[in-house]
């Protein structure tokens, strides 16, 4: 008998233990702004990142931590971060790597809000994006690379076109040119696709959609695979390899990366937490974190039904004379059907376009 936790058990219990005083089983809502310290040494260790723990709810809170721990476990990552929205998750992920004068290579098949961020808003901050000509062709990604390229980005299953990205092939090109691959896995969820297993380095989600599932709360998740070593490229990623004067001269790649005292490469996710979330403030409330956690517990059951319904609707639409085309990778007629069967054998999501 296997002792490994199933998807469902992890989604319900990871990152939280019964309360030691009351023995309460459910995840508490830690509706607090601040925390006490055991002594001055404990406080100093937390603020210097010698020890990880709660300082202020803008950057960490036990209710938030339980949810990103569950999400990280389901994705197969090393650590995560819960923020105010999916849009905030993408923005922090991009700004955690790229700075003014830098460049991003992206799939053109994106959620409209993400396209606006890359095409209109980030250029105002000095960050430009090239949308590849053909996201299905790895060489199209390679051709878009510039000397100042800092990351690749795409959606595992795109909203709303429902095309499936060949994560494995795109990740191979990204790593050959020395940049990380960020994947938005909102449509697929970790129940259908685990992008880190196909070579992605970082995964983002709008937890508002399928993870929350009830339309009551807005949140976003970042999960770090810990696989990209920024120390290997000191000139390309100076923000990871030079001292951060706002954090006591901390060098993220050296002090928090591969070979650090934490036993995992946490340079990306801790930089996102203690630098960007600290300064930009896109924090999620503990109450919203609790509501999203309630949804996560039933994710697998809901996604199975969503996929079942989407297949039926797509198949019916395909038979209608008045419907010119149906975009759904779960249809055998889809150009992404074979890739969808490989990367997402449980189903290619519940979104379709016609």
Q: Model-derived features: where do they sit?
A:
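N-terminal glycine-rich, Lys/His-bearing helix-loop that initiates the first secondary-structure elements
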Residues: 1-54
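Conserved N-terminal alpha-helix of the aminotransferase class I/II PLP-enzyme fold
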Residues: 34, 39-91, 113-121
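A short acidic, often aromatic-flanked loop/helix-cap motif at beta-alpha or helix-coil junctions
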Residues: 37, 136-140, 334-335
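Conserved glycine-rich beta-strand-loop-beta hairpin in the small C-terminal domain of fold type I
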Residues: 26, 311, 327-353
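Residues in well-ordered beta-strands of folded domains
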Residues: 13, 30-32, 57, 327-329, ...
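Conserved PLP-enzyme active-site core in the AAT-like
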Residues: 2-3, 13-20, 80-319, 327
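Short glycine-enriched loop/turn motifs at secondary-structure junctions
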Residues: 50, 74-75, 215, 346-348
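Hard-cation-handling environments
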Residues: 322
């Amino acid at each position: 008998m296997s002792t490994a936790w199933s998807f469902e058990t992890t989604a319900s219990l990871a990152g939280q233990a019964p309360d030691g005083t009351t023995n309460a089983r459910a995840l508490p809502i830690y509706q607090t702004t601040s925390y006490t310290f055991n002594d001055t040494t404990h406080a100093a260790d937390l603020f210097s990142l010698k020890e990880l723990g709660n300082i202020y709810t803008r950057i960490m809170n036990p209710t938030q931590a339980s949810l990103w721990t569950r999400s990280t476990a389901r994705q197969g990552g090393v650590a995560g971060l819960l923020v105010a929205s999916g849009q905030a998750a993408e923005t922090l992920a991009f700004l955690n790597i790229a700075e003014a004068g830098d460049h991003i290579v992206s799939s053109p098949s994106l959620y409209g809000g993400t396209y606006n961020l890359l095409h209109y808003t980030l250029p105002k901050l000095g960050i430009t994006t090239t949308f590849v000509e053909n996201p299905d062709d790895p060489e199209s990604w390679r051709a878009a690379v510039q000397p100042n390229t800092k990351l690749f980005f795409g959606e595992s299953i795109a909203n709303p076109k429902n095309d499936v990205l060949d994560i494995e092939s795109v990740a191979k090109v990204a790593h050959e040119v020395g940049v990380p691959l960020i994947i938005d896995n909102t449509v697929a969820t970790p129940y259908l696709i685990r992008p880190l297993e196909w070579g992605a380095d970082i995964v983002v989600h709008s937890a508002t959609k399928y993870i929350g599932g009830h339309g009551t709360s807005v949140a976003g998740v970042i999960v770090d695979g810990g696989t990209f070593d920024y120390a290997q490229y000191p000139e390309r990623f100076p923000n990871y390899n030079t001292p951060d004067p706002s954090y006591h001269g901390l060098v993220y790649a050296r002090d928090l990366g591969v070979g650090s005292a934490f036993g995992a490469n946490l340079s990306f996710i801790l930089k996102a937490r203690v630098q960007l979330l600290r300064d930009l403030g896109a924090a999620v409330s503990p109450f919203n974190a609790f509501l999203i956690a309630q949804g996560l517990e039933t994710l697998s059951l809901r996604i199975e039904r969503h996929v079942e319904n989407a297949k039926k609707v797509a198949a019916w639409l395909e038979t209608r004379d008045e419907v010119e085309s149906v975009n759904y990778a779960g249809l055998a007629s889809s150009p992404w059907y074979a890739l969808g069967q490989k990367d997402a054998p449980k189903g290619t999501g519940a979104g379709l376009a016609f």
